[in-house]
Each structure stands twice: as structure tokens, then as C-alpha cells.
Amino acid sequence: MKNNKSGKYLKYAFGEIVLVVLGILIALQINNWNDNRIANNNELKLIATLNEELISIRDELKINFESNNKNLKLVEEYLDEIEKSNEEKIIIISKLDTYRKSAVSHPIITNVLSANSSSSIGDNKLLKELRKLQLSYNEIKEWELYIDQLWNSKISDFLSRNNYAKSLVNYTRDQNYDDQDLIELYNNSEYKNIIALKWLIQNYWVREQRIALTETEKVIVMTEKK
């Protein structure tokens, strides 16, 4: 009798242990499933936020690229020394030194790619494209620094030193200006050399903007498929 009772107790205890273990395993499975679901939802939210940033960057880049590319063509027209009327020369000379700032802010991309970032994206292909995109944005910023330096060290100095700045400002503000000053500036060989330097920098700068715009469009498509 005692042996039978002991056997029953052992079977009962074993059954209880099995049930407890199964309960723990099920709880762990549910917990893992919840963790995965939360992680997946967080990733989708992050990608949605990333998509918004990319669209904003794309729109900004497009405006800046079109403006700077148009100005680049104007510089080329000036350097090619195509015959122009005095009125056309004044219009051209008033725009040669201009450019539109194009360095973009991308905090979400920076956060995603940060080595210490807790916001992870599991898609390695997307991460690879984001790294390429970040490099492209950095290239724009670097070339923009070069063109800023040229403006600060060469263009503004030349215009001030030769008293052309006031005529340009007056023309831009639609006030009285000396058109002969502007024609003289248009024909100035030193200024033409400075603008040629601007073209060299701006050509690479605009190219990087074009590349970044194309790459941004590509990554937008990738994020919208998620």
C-alpha cells in the first residue's frame, strides 16, 4: 500500500513539475513574441519617421539643386564669352557670385547609424544605403565649405577692393546703380578667373547634389515598401 501511495505521489509531483515547466515555457514564448512584436512595431515607426525625414530632404535638395545647377549654367555661359547685350551682361554679372546653401540636416539618419544607437533597423540593405546616403550628404557639406571659403577669401574681397560691391547691391535692391561699373566688372579678367574657380568647385558641388538627390529617392522607395 505504501509503495502504491508513494508511486502515486511521485507521478502527481512529476505531473505538477511538467505543468510548471510547460507554463514557464509558454510564458517565455509569449514574452518573446511580445518582445518581437514591440521591436517590430518600433522598427516600423522608426522607418516611418525616417521616411518623413527623407522626403523633406528630397524636397529641399531638389529646390537647391535646380537653383545651383541653373546658376552653374549661367557661369558657363559667362566663361564661354558668348556675345551679349549690355542689359544681358548686367543680369548675368548680378548672379554669378550667388549660390543656394544645400547642406542638409539629417538627425534621424545620424541616430540610426550611430554606433551607440538603441534604435536598430534589422534590414542590412537599408542600413547600407543609409550609410552611402550619409556620405553623400557629407560630400555636399564639404564642397559647400569650399565655395563658402572662395566667397569669403576671393569674391567678396575683390568686389570690395574694386568698389563693385555697392553697384551690385544697388542693382539687387532695384535702386540707382552705375551700369558702367557692372559692365566693367563683367569684362574684368581677374574677376573672370575668380568665377572660373567658382565653376570648378560648383561643378563638383552640384554633381554631389544630383547624386544625393538620386540616392535619396532610392532610399525613400525602400522605406515605403516596409
Describe each region flagged by the PLM.
Residues 1-11, 32-226:
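Long, hydrophobic alpha-helical segments that serve as membrane-spanning/inserting helices
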Residues 14-29:
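Hydrophobic membrane-insertion alpha-helices, especially the h-region
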